[in-house]
Amino acid sequence: MAKTIIDDKSRIENMITNIEYCIGKINSTEYADFVDNIDVRYAISMAVQIVCESAIHITNDTKNRFKEIEWKEMQTIRNIISHEYGALNLEILYNTIKDDFPVLKAKLEMIYEKIG
């Protein structure tokens, strides 16, 4: 089976879509409900993992062009979610989505408009 090549613009669009999903879920979920509801936690964690996995596969050219994105940090988050899920701090995850994802989304939307 041939490997499909996904371009940076498509990856960034996918990141934005999953960020929007996370923000929507977090904004409609109190922290206590987030902690208590395993389905919501898993859904949000998967969407965050998709965002971070997509970031890993962005080309170095794009990463070097847009250094305002913390590309390496997203790889670290992805590794924790994928390989050390028990070490995931739910409060940090919740607050990261609530506080940092809107800013990340805005930056990615700007990049999306600038790349071909």
Predicted regions and their residues:
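Solvent-exposed interaction patches of small proteins and small membrane subunits
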Residues: 1-116
